[in-house]
Amino acid sequence: MKLPIYLDYSATTPVDPRVAEKMMQCLTIDGIFGNPASRSHRFGWQAEEAIDIARNQIADLIGADPREIVFTSGATEADNLALKGVANFYQKKGKHIITSKTEHKAILDTCRQLEREGFEVTYLAPKSDGLIDLKELEAAMRDDTILVSIMHVNNEIGVVQDIAAIGELCRSKGIIYHVDATQSVGKLPIDLSKLKVDLLSLSAHKVYGPMGIGALYVRRKPRIRLEAQMHGGGHERGMRSGTLAVHQIVGMGEAYRILKEEMADETKRLNELRLRLWNGIKDIEEVYINGSLEHTAPNILNVSFNYVEGESLMMALKDLAVSSGSACTSASLEPSYVLRALGLTDELAHSSIRFSLGRFTTEEEIDYAIEQIHSAIGRLRDLSPLWEMHKQGVDINSIEWSHH
């Protein structure tokens, strides 16, 4: 077993060797290096064919038509294109958007920008288990609502929203529905031929593909229109200009092909590993699981260890690569906005750790992690005056601290 152990697969994943192999075939003079928009010679045709194959591999995994896949530089750009593209195109119909407080920053910050441009956004608070209340969603819908954006799997707590029910509700009201599926694709089945989802953001680097490439699914029937945010040569049916990065797209395609083959077995394996981890640490005093144990992704476990500072716990777990909150916001010392939205106190939100497992995680690594967590929590609580007071039966919340 190699140390340190990587348990931060929701931040990014290593590229699968099979994916790297395919990508390398698209870089050098002997490979498929042409510009796919070069229609006048074989180098361009080969590149175009490689992209067509990848587009089909991605569409196959999610039950889409390959013509509905628009390549972007990643899920953040896909989120921006979906929200700004719809808002700009349909603004004469209405200027109201609905999302939730626990969305990824790429959604929340895009919504903030649209608010500055004159749109109105309703931010729904989730229930304490992280799920959105459909009645609240319906109550928030208005005649001028043009878009709902609610993610499939939350990147911090792994809670799974009922995108099928949300899609039905949106379709019945004639409202466009966007889903950020960055954390769910390849872990949970997605069939867009059955789901009433109009736009769906995808990433490659969360599923053993390369960074810097993603896609936006844009439904053709009923047809969804977007205003382009990137202008130029009119690539991707005018929705996203820019020369297509053949090696990255081929890598994404291969990653999605592997997911389609291996997803069923891998989901079962990850679920077992996640439960093994939880069963190994749930007997620690004052430990709480964040989110819902039933409606959850197979690979994410977010836990709060009361009376232990999350940052110091991460330092103590020097042989485990874990995070507090998501990588996109882990540089800030603010408590996680996702956990605060669930109603956690600052203290509990600060004491949370996200463990995310993946393709190369083993039982041996999980058992080692359990051992390390037990000893680190013991050591840190021995140093904690708050823990001592808690053990003496003092109600910490009732203490009035004096500020110096």
Swiss-Prot record:
This is Cysteine desulfurase IscS. The modification N6-(pyridoxal phosphate)lysine is found at K206. It is found in: Cytoplasm. Pyridoxal 5'-phosphate binds at A75, T76, N155, Q183, S203, A204, H205, T243. Signal peptide: none annotated. [2Fe-2S] cluster binds at C328. It catalyses: (sulfur carrier)-H + L-cysteine = (sulfur carrier)-SH + L-alanine. Pathway: Cofactor biosynthesis; iron-sulfur cluster biosynthesis.
